[in-house]
Amino acid sequence: MFQATTIIAVRKGQQTAIAGDGQVTLGQNTIMKQNATKIRRLYEGKVIAGFAGAVADAFTLFAKFEEKLKQAGGNLSKAAVEIAREWRSDRILRRLEALLIVADAEKIFIVSGSGELIEPDDGIAAIGSGGAYALAAARALNAFSELNAREIAVESLKIASGICVYTNEQISVEVIEK
Protein backbone atom coordinates (compact mmCIF):
# COMPACT_ATOMS: atom_id res chain seq x y z
CA MET A 1 0.00 0.00 0.00
CA PHE A 2 2.57 2.61 1.11
CA GLN A 3 6.06 2.45 -0.30
CA ALA A 4 9.30 4.21 0.43
CA THR A 5 9.89 3.22 4.03
CA THR A 6 9.96 0.50 6.65
CA ILE A 7 9.04 0.91 10.32
CA ILE A 8 9.31 -1.88 12.90
CA ALA A 9 8.24 -2.06 16.54
CA VAL A 10 9.54 -4.74 18.91
CA ARG A 11 8.72 -5.38 22.56
CA LYS A 12 10.95 -7.84 24.40
CA GLY A 13 11.57 -8.10 28.12
CA GLN A 14 11.63 -4.65 29.69
CA GLN A 15 12.24 -2.82 26.42
CA THR A 16 10.10 -1.54 23.56
CA ALA A 17 11.77 -0.15 20.43
CA ILE A 18 10.55 1.43 17.22
CA ALA A 19 13.01 1.79 14.36
CA GLY A 20 12.72 3.24 10.89
CA ASP A 21 14.91 3.64 7.86
CA GLY A 22 15.84 7.06 6.51
CA GLN A 23 14.99 6.85 2.83
CA VAL A 24 12.48 9.25 1.24
CA THR A 25 11.50 8.32 -2.30
CA LEU A 26 9.76 10.53 -4.85
CA GLY A 27 7.56 8.44 -7.09
CA GLN A 28 8.86 5.03 -8.02
CA ASN A 29 12.42 5.81 -8.96
CA THR A 30 14.04 8.81 -7.24
CA ILE A 31 15.65 8.84 -3.79
CA MET A 32 15.20 12.37 -2.43
CA LYS A 33 16.67 11.95 1.04
CA GLN A 34 18.67 9.24 2.80
CA ASN A 35 18.51 10.18 6.48
CA ALA A 36 14.94 11.25 7.27
CA THR A 37 13.62 10.58 10.76
CA LYS A 38 10.23 8.86 10.76
CA ILE A 39 10.14 8.07 14.48
CA ARG A 40 8.99 10.50 17.18
CA ARG A 41 8.58 10.58 20.93
CA LEU A 42 5.17 11.77 22.13
CA TYR A 43 3.49 12.52 25.44
CA GLU A 44 6.50 13.56 27.50
CA GLY A 45 8.60 10.80 25.93
CA LYS A 46 6.37 7.99 27.24
CA VAL A 47 5.06 7.01 23.81
CA ILE A 48 6.96 6.41 20.59
CA ALA A 49 5.47 6.47 17.11
CA GLY A 50 6.59 5.85 13.56
CA PHE A 51 4.93 6.38 10.20
CA ALA A 52 4.88 5.09 6.67
CA GLY A 53 3.24 7.01 3.85
CA ALA A 54 2.93 10.63 2.83
CA VAL A 55 5.01 12.83 5.14
CA ALA A 56 2.56 15.74 5.41
CA ASP A 57 -0.27 13.30 6.12
CA ALA A 58 1.81 11.55 8.77
CA PHE A 59 2.59 14.84 10.54
CA THR A 60 -1.13 15.64 10.57
CA LEU A 61 -1.81 12.23 12.10
CA PHE A 62 0.99 12.64 14.66
CA ALA A 63 -0.57 15.92 15.78
CA LYS A 64 -4.06 14.40 15.96
CA PHE A 65 -2.77 11.34 17.80
CA GLU A 66 -0.83 13.43 20.32
CA GLU A 67 -3.98 15.47 20.95
CA LYS A 68 -5.92 12.24 21.62
CA LEU A 69 -3.11 11.01 23.86
CA LYS A 70 -3.29 14.17 25.97
CA GLN A 71 -7.08 13.91 26.20
CA ALA A 72 -6.70 10.29 27.34
CA GLY A 73 -4.17 11.21 30.02
CA GLY A 74 -1.44 9.18 28.32
CA ASN A 75 -3.58 6.03 27.97
CA LEU A 76 -2.23 4.59 24.71
CA SER A 77 -5.08 2.12 24.17
CA LYS A 78 -7.78 4.76 24.57
CA ALA A 79 -5.95 7.27 22.36
CA ALA A 80 -5.38 4.64 19.65
CA VAL A 81 -9.07 3.67 19.63
CA GLU A 82 -10.09 7.33 19.44
CA ILE A 83 -7.74 8.20 16.58
CA ALA A 84 -8.85 5.10 14.64
CA ARG A 85 -12.50 6.02 15.19
CA GLU A 86 -11.92 9.63 14.11
CA TRP A 87 -9.79 8.57 11.15
CA ARG A 88 -12.57 6.30 9.93
CA SER A 89 -15.38 8.83 10.34
CA ASP A 90 -13.74 12.15 9.35
CA ARG A 91 -13.94 12.87 5.60
CA ILE A 92 -10.66 14.78 5.54
CA LEU A 93 -8.71 12.30 7.67
CA ARG A 94 -9.95 9.40 5.53
CA ARG A 95 -8.03 10.87 2.59
CA LEU A 96 -4.72 10.86 4.46
CA GLU A 97 -2.28 8.29 3.11
CA ALA A 98 -0.28 7.07 6.07
CA LEU A 99 0.02 4.26 8.58
CA LEU A 100 1.16 4.67 12.17
CA ILE A 101 2.82 2.36 14.65
CA VAL A 102 2.45 3.63 18.22
CA ALA A 103 3.88 2.06 21.37
CA ASP A 104 4.46 2.56 25.05
CA ALA A 105 6.18 0.25 27.54
CA GLU A 106 3.20 -2.14 27.53
CA LYS A 107 1.49 -2.11 24.13
CA ILE A 108 2.09 -1.73 20.40
CA PHE A 109 -0.60 -0.75 17.88
CA ILE A 110 -0.79 -0.32 14.13
CA VAL A 111 -3.32 2.36 13.14
CA SER A 112 -4.39 2.27 9.50
CA GLY A 113 -6.04 4.83 7.25
CA SER A 114 -9.18 2.74 7.04
CA GLY A 115 -9.63 3.07 10.79
CA GLU A 116 -8.28 -0.36 11.66
CA LEU A 117 -6.48 -0.80 14.95
CA ILE A 118 -4.24 -3.85 15.27
CA GLU A 119 -2.36 -5.02 18.36
CA PRO A 120 0.12 -7.77 17.47
CA ASP A 121 -0.02 -10.98 19.51
CA ASP A 122 3.74 -11.37 19.70
CA GLY A 123 4.83 -7.79 20.44
CA ILE A 124 6.24 -7.26 16.95
CA ALA A 125 4.68 -5.09 14.23
CA ALA A 126 5.92 -3.62 10.96
CA ILE A 127 4.58 -1.31 8.27
CA GLY A 128 5.74 0.06 4.95
CA SER A 129 7.16 -1.43 1.79
CA GLY A 130 9.75 -3.53 3.62
CA GLY A 131 7.42 -4.32 6.51
CA ALA A 132 6.87 -7.99 5.70
CA TYR A 133 10.63 -8.61 5.42
CA ALA A 134 11.39 -6.77 8.66
CA LEU A 135 8.55 -8.57 10.44
CA ALA A 136 9.79 -12.02 9.37
CA ALA A 137 13.36 -11.16 10.34
CA ALA A 138 12.30 -9.76 13.73
CA ARG A 139 10.22 -12.84 14.54
CA ALA A 140 13.16 -15.12 13.73
CA LEU A 141 15.63 -12.99 15.71
CA ASN A 142 13.22 -12.85 18.65
CA ALA A 143 12.78 -16.62 18.68
CA PHE A 144 16.35 -17.69 18.03
CA SER A 145 18.65 -15.06 19.53
CA GLU A 146 19.40 -13.30 22.79
CA LEU A 147 19.19 -9.84 21.20
CA ASN A 148 17.18 -7.15 23.01
CA ALA A 149 14.28 -5.23 21.43
CA ARG A 150 16.49 -2.42 20.11
CA GLU A 151 18.97 -4.83 18.53
CA ILE A 152 16.19 -6.91 16.95
CA ALA A 153 14.58 -3.79 15.46
CA VAL A 154 17.87 -2.55 13.97
CA GLU A 155 18.96 -5.94 12.61
CA SER A 156 15.55 -6.66 11.08
CA LEU A 157 15.65 -3.30 9.26
CA LYS A 158 19.12 -4.09 7.95
CA ILE A 159 17.78 -7.37 6.58
CA ALA A 160 14.77 -5.61 5.02
CA SER A 161 17.05 -3.00 3.43
CA GLY A 162 18.89 -5.77 1.63
CA ILE A 163 15.63 -6.87 0.00
CA CYS A 164 13.40 -3.78 -0.35
CA VAL A 165 14.60 -1.05 -2.72
CA TYR A 166 12.58 1.57 -0.79
CA THR A 167 14.39 0.86 2.50
CA ASN A 168 17.94 1.86 3.43
CA GLU A 169 20.34 1.28 6.34
CA GLN A 170 20.18 4.83 7.72
CA ILE A 171 18.26 3.67 10.80
CA SER A 172 16.82 5.76 13.60
CA VAL A 173 15.60 4.09 16.80
CA GLU A 174 13.67 5.17 19.88
CA VAL A 175 13.46 2.94 22.96
CA ILE A 176 11.24 2.91 26.04
CA GLU A 177 12.28 0.94 29.11
CA LYS A 178 9.80 -0.35 31.69
From Swiss-Prot:
Keywords attached to this Swiss-Prot or TrEMBL record, sorted alphabetically, are: Allosteric enzyme, Cytoplasm, Hydrolase, Metal-binding, Protease, Sodium, Threonine protease
Ligand binding (Na(+)) = S161, C164, T167
Gene Ontology biological process:
proteolysis involved in protein catabolic process
- Top enzyme category: hydrolase
| Organism superkingdom | Bacteria
Regulation affecting activity? Allosterically activated by HslU binding.
The annotated active site, in chain numbering, is: T5
Complexes and interactors:
A double ring-shaped homohexamer of HslV is capped on each side by a ring-shaped HslU homohexamer. The assembly of the HslU/HslV complex is dependent on binding of ATP.
Q: Which family does it belong to?
A: Belongs to the peptidase T1B family. HslV subfamily.
Q: What is this protein called?
A: ATP-dependent protease subunit HslV
* Species, as recorded: Syntrophomonas wolfei subsp. wolfei (strain DSM 2245B / Goettingen)
